[in-house]
């Protein structure tokens, strides 16, 4: 995969990330042993670079936020991209566009099984039978730190069914938008939430 092709895919995905996830909290509601539970996630501009699998080096201001701004402004130079593992980048870029719809399409959640990949440091996995996104807890929220082209059931100790997803802007106090509800779930069930 050539760097120009990689940049084009990432530019399109950055726009989708900006529209769907950036500066938003998502609340994933799920069943665990017939008890309704949830986790709260936070998506920041600085998280986008981690989801792509690439490394970004500039002469000055080498950070994930600068990369996100540069990619949206179409100012990323080929010489500043570092491809560490082309195979991993191909896998990530094959699913990145789909996974950025996680606010509408996540079906399962589970604890990461560290026996799957010893070097991968993530805690919660949210996804489908095609893709998964990993999250680590930072403060009160889980933030995304990886994407995997992998059936969630293969990389978690146990999966739980996502029954609803709520979204809000980070600055809002309350969740204002229901983006997904499992067709077998009634709203009244969701409001019996326990942490």
Regions found by a protein language model. Give the residues of each.
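An acidic, glycine-rich, mixed-charge low-complexity segment common to nucleic-acid enzymes
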Residues: 1-120, 168-195
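Compact beta-sheet-dominated globular domain cores
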Residues: 128-181
